[in-house]
Amino acid sequence: MASPRELDEESPVYLVVSGIPAVLRSAQLRSYFSQFREQRGGGFLCFHYRHRPERGPPQASPEAARAGPDPAAEDPVLAQAPASDARAVRARGSAAAQTRTCCCVVSVRGAAQAQRLLRMYSGRRWLDSQGTWLPGRCLIRRLRLPTEVSDLGSFPFKTRKELQSRRAENEAFTLADLKQLPELNPPVLMPNGNVGTPLRVFLELIRSCRLPPRIITQLQLQFPKTGSSRRYGNVPFLYEDSETVEQEEHVYTAEGEEIPQGSCSEDPAAGSFDEPEDEGQQQEEEEESGSEEDDDRGEEWERHEALHEDVTGQERTTERLFEEEIELKWEKGGSGLVFYTDAQFWQEEEGDFDEQTADDWDVDMSVYYDRDGGDKDARDSVQMRLERRLREGQEDGSVLGGQVGTFERHTKGIGRKVMERQGWAEGQGLGSRCSGVPEALDGDGQHPRCKRGLGYHGEKLQPFRQLKRPRRTGLGLISTIYDEPLPQDQGETLLRRQPPTSMKFRTDMTFVKGSSCALDRPEPE
């Protein structure tokens, strides 16, 4: 049989969460109370938010005192009205001046969980899902029934005045009335309410195919990524004779925003006036920190890797072989081979110390990231590499693949928009009959065979002409799918080069698939 203390710890405790802004929905409240809801061995017994409006006590403001006397005292009609109607008029006036808030009755298991809920959330500021502060604070109070306060049951005898009164017999709010509230009777699919039901319950319903998809959308459920629970790695080591220092518990939302702690005596209106100053100070700090950050397209390590071979010393490409005709002394039993591996020779080839350690900070590297970036020297260097690759047949620079109007990147496409409104499409000529030239003409300014004077840019290349491959006189090899080079062995591109680990010397062997006609050909009889 359980002791009375254990029963008191397991008995449900009812609390009232008040001051909830009307703009908050159940999905935002799930994010706000996620840390308490998802804890192991605890959480809410029931938290079903139904947007129940609350009516705060009337507060006399100095503006109302200076406004004049009570209108009910001056107007005889309001003076003759019942007291309940007068209170309703005052309540409507005060509600219009204040922000409308809601409340909700919740239940937790035991007094320890109730104290933990009060310690974590009572008096903290409200936050939405984006981490924005909302007016008001979270107020949590324990709900005590009249029978719990007096520790007495209902008195069986009544006086004559009580018998003649028209008041209801069940006017006192009892525990049975409390359990009939819609906040404590959630749907079957949400046993702990739309706010208090943990994610593991919804996961079980999804596994059993019993959860409607609309609930996931309404509550904005975000399930964690599947993976190890790390239940064995998160166990702390218990040292002997160790004293634990109690620290203030930080409360976070589901998005990782920390819920600020503050006393209820602080004026939220005064805090709202300080926000623009804080935003300006934060913007100045961001500008100062942004000046120190390195936002260049070519980082320092990328430059070092591009200018030096084997920067990590893992590929061992520094040990190169160099053969030279030298006088070789006969060695009995020797191989007769000499590999010249003098490191001093290669250090002299690399230059002095300044040349070896230079990172070329004066060179504009933006041309390797942006086609129109860089200075003239960098663009000319890329153009020279492009022409050399075109001569060697390594680059396919056909003019037919270019797009019309690449200059419109600088004009924001204004000319294209105007022509498209008139019915023009890409690839068509101008005019009502589309008889114009669809492609722009290159104005060289001189005869193409004239290789002197103003306007001469160098050798005129024919990028659309493919070079003929020389016929091989070797043996005919049967190719396989494994002869095709891997993606990391495709060779260098115009703006990027392959790492030293890629295969540079290999025989190109194109794989030719067998045709079905050759297989289906009938054999001669």
Curated annotation (Swiss-Prot):
It comes from the Eukaryota. Residues 300-317 have a biased composition (Basic and acidic residues). InterPro entries: G_patch_dom, GPATCH3. Keywords: Cytoplasm, Nucleus. Residues 274-299 have a biased composition (Acidic residues). Residues 411-459 form the G-patch domain. Involved in transcriptional regulation. It is able to activate transcription from CXCR4 promoter and therefore it might control neural crest cell migration involved in ocular and craniofacial development. Is a negative regulator of immune antiviral response, acting via down-regulation of RIG-I-like receptors signaling and inhibition of type I interferon production. The control mechanism involves interaction with mitochondrial MAVS and inhibition of MAVS assembly with downstream proteins implicated in antiviral response, such as TBK1 and TRAF6. This is G patch domain-containing protein 3. GO terms for cellular component: cytoplasm; cytosol; nucleoplasm; nucleus. Residues 54-85, 246-317 are annotated as: Disordered. It is found in: Nucleus; Cytoplasm. Interacts with mitochondrial MAVS; the interaction is markedly increased upon viral infection. One of its GO terms (biological process) is positive regulation of DNA-templated transcription. GO terms for molecular function: nucleic acid binding. It holds the Pfam family G-patch. It comes from Mus musculus. Its main location: nucleus. Signal peptide: none annotated.
